[in-house]
């Protein structure tokens, strides 16, 4: 009988994919389904992107690439960050990975080990807590407060930091609440983090372009005082 490592028992799953599978089964049975279980747009990949991807393959742009990703793509990402967030990022600091979960997994494994503490938003994306536990670190939830429109209290987060804290995970706009942290609270958090140089920050901003009611998205990239640990 196969024996898996103990840490595999600490790796949870994302139930949204179970909902997706059930919804697709019902759709095949002819049911009219509106699936709210997974973060996927209701439109297909735009045609010009499909055409360019197909053309690149036909032109021979495949095979192994540099580990961080091809330079033209990293330069394009840097240009997009400058355009949308007003920050300059050296393309040499950009790494292209196949999806957000891979980024989270790598970042958490870089800092997570027995005895370490990692702070993560709660309620939040379930993979945060799952991978923290997989790494052997202690998962410390930072509450997102309903009375603050599911934002956090910067002072409360800073009070949770100890000498064992290795990583602070932020997600704004947040999954699943949709809450966005206001600039004043992020200013306060960053000012406090200056006193905790041993703490790295993982800023999950995947929903930065899904913002309504004129709400401002504040990127952690715009704070040079923590750029070396972001």
Task: Give the ranges of each region predicted by the language model.
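Active-site phosphate-binding strand-loop segment of PLP-dependent enzymes
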Residues: 140, 145-215
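A short helix-loop-beta submotif of the ANL/AMP-binding
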Residues: 134-140
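N-terminal small-domain helix-loop-helix segment of the aminotransferase-like
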Residues: 2-99, 106
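Conserved PLP-anchoring active-site segment centered on the Schiff-base-forming lysine
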Residues: 110-132
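A structural alpha-helix within SAM-dependent methyltransferase catalytic domains
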Residues: 20, 24, 54, 158-162, ...
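Short acidic capping loops at alpha-helix termini that bridge into adjacent secondary structure
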Residues: 88-94, 115-117, 164, 227-230
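Conserved active-site segment immediately N-terminal to the catalytic lysine
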Residues: 200, 216-230
């Amino acid at each position: 009988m196969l024996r898996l490592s103990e840490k595999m028992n600490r790796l949870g799953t994302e139930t949204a994919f179970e909902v997706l599978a059930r919804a697709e089964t019902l759709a095949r049975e002819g049911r009219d389904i509106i699936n709210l279980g997974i973060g996927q747009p209701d439109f297909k990949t735009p045609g010009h992107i499909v055409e360019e991807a197909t053309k690149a393959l036909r032109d021979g742009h495949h095979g192994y690439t540099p580990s961080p990703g091809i330079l033209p793509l990293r330069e394009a990402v840097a240009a997009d960050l400058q355009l949308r967030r007003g920050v300059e990022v050296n393309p040499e600091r950009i790494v292209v990975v196949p999806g957000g979960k891979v980024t989270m997994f790598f970042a958490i494994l870089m800092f997570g080990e027995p005895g370490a503490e990692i702070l993560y938003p709660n309620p939040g994306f379930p993979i945060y807590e799952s991978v923290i536990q997989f790494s052997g670190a202690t998962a410390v939830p930072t509450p997102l407060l309903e009375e603050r429109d599911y934002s956090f209290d910067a002072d409360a987060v800073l009070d949770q930091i100890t000498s064992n804290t290795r990583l602070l995970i932020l997600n704004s706009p947040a999954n699943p609440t949709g809450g966005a942290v206001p600039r004043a609270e992020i200013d306060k958090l960053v000012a406090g983090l200056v006193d905790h140089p041993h703490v790295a920050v993982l800023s999950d901003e995947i929903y930065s372009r899904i913002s309504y009611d004129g709400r401002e998205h504040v990127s952690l990239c715009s704070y040079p005082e923590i750029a070396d640990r972001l």
